[in-house]
């Protein structure tokens, strides 16, 4: 059975950014994820959200969001998987370090990766990617 957009998964930075911009589809998707099994993000996405803050108010909002979110770390196995993918796909597909780390976090945790940028990940063997909206 193919995973649906309500299956537990890791949420990519692009969807989180949409939610901070109050995009209704992103907010509805995050609400469904939270209700179903909670929201999971990579520490890389948490850092990207933090780096995107323009002021103390936005930073506080991001911190409050992350307090209610499971933030998955970069483990040794995540690092090794990401490094292998970088070696295999950087030159041919332009795979970037943050994308490799986020994808490897999802892969190693056995989770679907939810992203609007499915083309960034389509070459990665064994990774399940869904565009949720």
Language-model segment annotations:
Residues 2-7, 69-116:
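Active-site neighborhoods of divalent-metal-dependent phosphate/nucleic-acid chemistry enzymes
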Residues 15-16, 45, 78, 101-102, ...:
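Alpha-helix capping/helix-boundary segments
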Residues 16-17, 47-50, 122, 130:
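Nucleotide phosphate-binding site architecture
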